[in-house]
Amino acid sequence: MSFFFVALLSAVWRWVGKGDTEVFASMVDSLFSMAKLSVEVMILLFGTLTLWLGFLKIAEHAGLVEKIASWLSPLFRRLMPEVPKNHPAAGLITMNFIANGLGLDNAATPIGLKAMRSLQSLNPTPKIASNAQILFLVMNASSLTLLPVSIFMYRAQQGALDPTLVFLPILLATSASTLAGFFSVAFMQRIKLNDPVVITWMLAIASLLSVFILFLSHLSASALGAFSSLLGNAVLFGLIVTFLLIGILKRVPVYESFIEGAKEGFDVSKNLLPYLIAMLCAVGILRASGALDVVLDMIRYLADSFHWDTRFVDALPTALVKPFSGSAARAMLIDTMTTHGVDSFPSFLAATVQGSTETTFYVLAVYFGAVGIQRARHAVACALFADLVGVLASIGVCYWFFG
């Protein structure tokens, strides 16, 4: 409701203050176009969910998910106390984070939805998000991106001298975003981070990431692109083969298990559509009202007042629309590259922001909508805080790297 109210105020201002008589027509057009987009997105998700939930059901029947959960049980007992020991949600959450980090969106979303449904089975208040669900959603919305291949592709298409020049800035900014999301939820939920088990896991993860980043930073642009493509596709296909092989070795009825999981994908898709339409239509109305332009004008005015460098403002359209729409943010990124030049400061910053933040409200609609959550509690605030830190970190890192 707040989106519609803000959009109304912005539209009235554009109509009365600026004489824009087309603003309400634009908002109505956006409303119906976003409703259409919701159905198109749902059709794509339907196929992906059906496929991956089928494979996941094989892994579940073979005991693979339970095995991963048992390995991670000591950590999850501290971060998500309401999740029982060896609960399959722990394994699914881990697989989702790995898929997100490697940029495997086609696998990450179905696995994530399966994890959210698993957490929902433990939720004593089905309409209200539990602490575990909030932590999972915020970490998903601010997920660490290790291989931002799509950003490199956009820069290469625009003729960048070195498409991977923003690789390290993106890694630093996305790390800041992920840490901000985690610590904000930990603060809200009073999670004890000084526990030896938590510290050990955090140090181990940080060490692995450091080694991986060090390895990637020494690759050339062409080698990094080739490695990214090889790793992503190999992991994706490797997961499928692993699920099938373990299923066969454990004498799981593979075909029957796949069909059972695929049917779950149909049920999830059917329940998700109303929530997706509601969120995307609200976002479309807000964008069409011009409210984001008002925010940009205010930021530019404040920067001028304090005599700050204002080059960063030219990249902020990408930052402002990214929480609402991934496609709109991509369009803003490409527009910035075209307008200012692909190797300009605004383009470097826009690319870094695009690679370090997530479509928060889309993630919220998909993950909570799939299980019927109506009250998100502090999930939205923590996710948006992570986005804000990601944007601020992007600005700081880009001034550090590119001056």
Residue ranges and their predicted role:
Residues 107-108, 115-155, 160-190, 316-403:
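C-terminal transmembrane helix pair
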Residues 22-121, 250-339:
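Membrane-embedded alpha-helical segments and adjacent helix-loop junctions characteristic
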Residues 32, 39, 88-90, 125-133, ...:
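Hydrophobic alpha-helical segments, principally membrane-spanning helices and signal/leader peptides
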Residues 25-26, 40, 82-83, 121, ...:
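Mixed-charge, polar/low-complexity N-terminal
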Residues 94, 98, 133, 224-227, ...:
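Generic signal for short, ordered secondary-structure residues
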Residues 5, 52, 61, 101, ...:
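Short glycine/serine/threonine-biased micro-segments
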Residues 1-47, 156-286, 305-306, 378-403:
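Signature of multi-pass transmembrane helix bundles
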